[in-house]
């Protein structure tokens, strides 16, 4: 009998109502806002309300430098969380949110795989509660305000050839990597070369993941540097009066999302900064809540140990104040063979490569 696909397994799963999942980790109803039957947002007041509860053991899952296909950190994280529950330990897992670009690319979704998945499958990998779209909108709001500032006379003296803030989109669109904006009539803006990055690479996404409160996020957004003046001085979002607008757009996005695994293990899924251009870890607020919800909080550091794990220890943990108790390193023969320089890992993994 052939092995069912990940999607078939996910669709055959029996899920708990999200209110029951929240109850399992001690979240009262007033701290949980359902988004349908199987997803919810957690109010940030939970950080204070749960603070007096015992602290869970904090476990980080990382990996050797992965191949383009990924080596299974998420699958291992989910499987470990489910296994803890099988031996009578109350475990919660904490993961980054999926980016739609890689979901439709060679790497695929971010739900795990096989019988170690976070569900609902489609919601997790596409849109979820709209956090990605909120980050996209906030980022592009700042881009629009920057271009409008240039059009309105450039009072700050911004050097048009030294602007570092581009636009973002949660789609792998090669044709938008480098573009020229402001073409057309004079009222259509100042022509200049810019481009699009993917939303997960946005500094606004990194800010979302590192913020400890709404006020902290407001301050961090205001400190974003968008470019430099002709005198070489940095120009910030605060100087463009964009920090408040960005915060309002992202006000719901800062609340962590609650889902579950195939075996009903609670999963906090929040924020998705990349590990190559940012710190590659799920949100600080998600872990500040999750650390008081059971015996173990198991989180994943994105990319390889030299990227996500290094930044987990040196950036995320310093912001959250949480210290890990153990680390799990995922290692595959496929990755080791790929790094030997003798094998090129592509879409199909033929038998001799695995």
Question: For the regions a protein language model found, what residue spans apply to each?
Answer:
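Flexible phosphate-sensing "switch/lid" loops adjacent to ATP/NTP-binding sites
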Residues: 1-353
